[in-house]
């Protein structure tokens, strides 16, 4: 997971636009990534929530994740972060399926 705050002075719309139309395109080029999703905080319902959104990047292993970020595509992706976010809190989690359709 990557939990993000928009860049200081950037509108929420510009943040959302950059993430979806620039950063997500770069992210989808990561080698061995199986799934990617972007989730935005509903500002109408949670105007004071401390973050603006989070992403989920799915890999088969932590080794695949590390290799992806060390790749040229990963380095390009990381270099784009300051263009739209001031804070990113990365979390590595392992999914435990409790109920799955």
Predicted regions and their residues:
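Macromolecular interaction modules
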Residues: 1-101
